[in-house]
Design a protein with these regions (language model features):
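Conserved active-site tyrosine of GNAT-family acetyltransferases
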Residues: 124, 129
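Short hydrophobic/aromatic beta-strand or adjacent loop that forms the aromatic wall/cage
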Residues: 42, 143-147
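Acetyl-CoA-dependent GNAT
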Residues: 3-71, 75-76, 88-90, 94, ...
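Short glycine/proline-centered loop/turn elements that form peptide/ligand docking sites
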Residues: 117-120, 134-144
Length: 152
């Protein structure tokens, strides 16, 4: 597996290809399109199997001390192979280079029983993220948001 920073003009098309292949996580068209638009302006690291992208992560600066893991997505057939963890390590290093001391991530709260997001939360916890707060209405009552944080 090869990991590389993604040039500006390649970010949105790469994001679209991965997210459209993950409808269990990114099946709400409006949300998916918002992510695709947002990544164009964010730092992105991708994982490649040969020339084919199989996952990516994006970083959004928040405050001088905090950055957000804006998005991380790996094709489902490549789950549980350490790709997400490697993408996260590279995003963490980039956040530290930018002066961040903490990394945050938002995900679906446990009050929504979606099994895919239960696995996502377990991944974040294994990577050292801790739950901070639930925002029950940020994404709508059916999609409560959990904010998690990790010290870098």
């Amino acid at each position: 597996m090869r990991y590389a920073h993604v040039p500006d003009q390649q970010r949105s098309p790469l994001c679209r290809a991965i997210l459209e292949a993950l409808p269990a996580w990114f099946g709400i068209p409006e949300s998916r399109e918002a992510y695709i638009a947002e990544v164009a302006a964010l730092a992105m690291v991708a994982a490649y199997d040969g020339a084919k992208p199989v996952g990516f992560a994006t970083l959004r600066p928040q405050t001088p001390a905090t950055a957000e893991l804006h998005l991380i997505a790996v094709l489902e057939r490549h789950h549980r192979h350490g790709i997400g963890a490697q993408l996260l390590r590279r995003i963490e290093a980039l956040a530290q280079q930018q002066g961040a001391r903490f990394l945050t991530v938002k995900t679906l709260a446990p009050s929504n029983p979606d099994p895919g997001y239960a696995a996502t939360r377990a991944f974040y916890e294994r990577q050292g993220f801790l739950p901070v707060e639930v925002f029950p209405l940020l994404w709508g009552p059916e999609n409560p948001c959990l904010l998690m944080i990790k010290a870098l």
